Amino acid sequence: MAFHNNHFNHFTDQQQHQPPPPPQQQQQQHFQESAPPNWLLRSDNNFLNLHTAASAAATSSDSPSSAAANQWLSRSSSFLQRGNTANNNNNETSGDVIEDVPGGEESMIGEKKEAERWQNARHKAEILSHPLYEQLLSAHVACLRIATPVDQLPRIDAQLAQSQNVVAKYSTLEAAQGLLAGDDKELDHFMTHYVLLLCSFKEQLQQHVRVHAMEAVMACWEIEQSLQSFTGVSPGEGTGATMSEDEDEQVESDAHLFDGSLDGLGFGPLVPTESERSLMERVRQELKHELKQGYKEKIVDIREEILRKRRAGKLPGDTTSVLKSWWQSHSKWPYPTEEDKARLVQETGLQLKQINNWFINQRKRNWHSNPSSSTVSKNKRRSNAGENSGRDR
């Protein structure tokens, strides 16, 4: 069984009339998939067909096959094409022979195309029922997330939510055709190697975004800074000054000359483009994610240490109740003697240092709420000061 390059292009409602793709898209799309069976064209799903803005606006075209030009999903690797060269050559040869047959044989061409469509649908049903399909889909979507602008990422999630509809379609086909998930070593080999290929491609894309693309953005920024230092004009800067008409004309001519030199050199605008801003935002998100992953363990350890110290600083509730009881009974003079402290140590099981710290903090908390104790303290200090002054005399 051979797996052709279009086996990952799920049948969706993609037969909208669309204008022909531009030349750049035509160069990138060497493989055109055949039209799906009619029974699969009733779906409103748009499973990972990310190029839908242009197709929805252009419904007056007469070329149904151009729907494949806007499809992102499923451009299989080159090793899949090499494995099917013989089959493709045979199909092309048979097609040429049929074309030479008179017009009465056109029905044979239609039957041949219909058989190819159902064969492709059968292969897709086998792929979707394979145990590695979820891993294959996850690896492919991971590559898409790297190459997709940040503001377009929610569209991938929205289309992933419709994946069950696609699986249900091909499950119906599989049940109707009586397909059984048997021991297909070729399919297992294909699924395993394709998942590994996508994972490797994801790493290459990440390396490109983090290193090469960021270097290109920084190089453009350095060029802008150099131009600004040479000319003294910053991006989007206005003069805001009042000049005479002659000076205005001179400045205007200089500005036109400066703009022309920029166009001639091909530097383009000095302000970042939307793609550059999206790329810088993606790099920032990637670096933020890496920093979180790299310092996650240290952050967790520091948090646990802080919580442990907080828990260690709090005394048990039964011990504080004993200390509070003593405090309330001695509210006029909340200064325990050494004998009182020794008795509290025996009753609470705390250390002498802990008891001293608790009374210090308790007096600070109740310094203004207990005027009687503060008055007694002041009177005692005054009496002690008077006795000391009398002795000095």
UniProtKB/Swiss-Prot annotation:
Keywords: DNA-binding, Homeobox, Nucleus. Gene3D superfamilies: Homeodomain-like (1.10.10.60). This is Homeobox protein knotted-1-like 4. Residues 1-13, 368-377 have a biased composition (Polar residues). One of its GO terms (molecular function) is DNA-binding transcription factor activity. PANTHER family: HOMEOBOX PROTEIN TRANSCRIPTION FACTORS. Belongs to the TALE/KNOX homeobox family. It comes from the Eukaryota. It is found in: Nucleus. May form heterodimeric complex with the TALE/BELL proteins. Interacts with OFP1, OFP2, OFP4 and OFP12. Interacts with KNATM-B. Residues 1-39, 81-114, 363-393 are annotated as: Disordered. Its main location: nucleus. Residues 286-306 form the ELK domain. SMART domains: ELK, HOX, KNOX1, KNOX2. One of its GO terms (biological process) is response to light stimulus. Residues 307-370 bind DNA. It comes from Arabidopsis thaliana.
